[in-house]
Amino acid sequence: MSETTYFGRVITAMVTPFTVEGQVNYALVEKLADYLVTHGSDGIVVCGTTGESPTLSWQEEYELFSIVKKAVNGRGKVIAGTGSNSTSEAIEATQQAAKLGLDGSLQVVPYYNKPPQEGLYEHFLTIAKACPDLPVMLYNIPGRTGQNMTPETIIKLAAVDNIVAVKEASGNLEQTCKIYCHTPENFAIYSGDDFLTLPLMTCGAVGVVSVASHLVGEEIQGMIQALLTGDAAKAIEINLKLFPLFKGLFCATNPIPIKAALNLVGWEVGGLRLPLCSLSPELEEGLAKIMQELALI
């Protein structure tokens, strides 16, 4: 990959809408994907954390890959969340995503079995080699996986041709700086947290894998473009305006708040599959107040 921003600047980690019966609402998936790429998103991650991948079957995921790819219709990149703590399972899902014509795969650090750093390296290397034509975005999120993938491991993996990016959700600016300084120029770092996008971009990140872009994608895009064109004051202004929303969308475990927010604005994305549960009335009231202040509802 020769282009640092191959996946774009603002990538939405898309929710998976459900019907009242708890089935995937494929018709609404199509409409939401279309909306996102016309309202600030350069790409979509489908079946990531925000998409409730742990409670989706692989068959549901493959159907979602296909529908989102068709809905986006070349107007942005579609990245499949095919990560697993089983290397063979991740390979099978990634190969299926490649067959369906997706633009990349998101590979999360294996959770629960807690491999050492060498195991992480071998895991991601094996997946990348099994699907050499599909770009890979690594996903480091210690708060969910139980361990941090070190900069040294990420730097080593960045030498693999089709490992082109990392979603950094460690919240560690020093780690981001180290990755940026020791990876190839065309290796892209994305913030995994909306509220850290601006700080991480000053450390070399190119954009964000966003949750808030469901609601304010154009504003986030505007913030990034302001920074890129040298208007730091404007970028800071936008960031501070959106900051309460960025934090409000993490008042409970993601994607509980963003689903509540989307329901508030009329998207009717439904509830969540257990063990996730609905946002409490008190937290929903607080989130609604933030959204009202931004004229979102």
UniProtKB/Swiss-Prot annotation:
PROSITE patterns: DHDPS_1, DHDPS_2
Gene Ontology molecular function terms on file: 4-hydroxy-tetrahydrodipicolinate synthase activity
Disulfide linkage: none
Catalytic activity: L-aspartate 4-semialdehyde + pyruvate = (2S,4S)-4-hydroxy-2,3,4,5-tetrahydrodipicolinate + H2O + H(+)
EC number: 4.3.3.7
Pfam families: DHDPS (PF00701)
Keywords for the protein's UniProt record, in alphabetical order: Amino-acid biosynthesis, Cytoplasm, Diaminopimelate biosynthesis, Lyase, Lysine biosynthesis, Schiff base
Compartments where located: Cytoplasm
InterPro entries in the record: Aldolase_TIM (IPR013785), DapA (IPR005263), DapA-like (IPR002220), Schiff_base-form_aldolases_AS (IPR020625), Schiff_base-form_aldolases_CS (IPR020624)
This protein's record includes keyword Zinc: no
Domain of life: Bacteria
Any one GO cellular component localisation term in the record: cytosol
Predominant location: cytoplasm
A GO BP entry: lysine biosynthetic process via diaminopimelate
Pathway annotation from the record: Amino-acid biosynthesis; L-lysine biosynthesis via DAP pathway; (S)-tetrahydrodipicolinate from L-aspartate: step 3/4
Catalytic residues, chain numbering: 139, 167
Binding sites annotated in the UniProt record for pyruvate: 50, 209
Site (Part of a proton relay during catalysis): 49, 112
Its biological purpose: Catalyzes the condensation of (S)-aspartate-beta-semialdehyde [(S)-ASA] and pyruvate to 4-hydroxy-tetrahydrodipicolinate (HTPA).
PANTHER family: 4-HYDROXY-2-OXOGLUTARATE ALDOLASE, MITOCHONDRIAL, DIHYDRODIPICOLINATE SYNTHASE
Family membership: Belongs to the DapA family.
Subunit structure: Homotetramer; dimer of dimers.
Protein name: 4-hydroxy-tetrahydrodipicolinate synthase
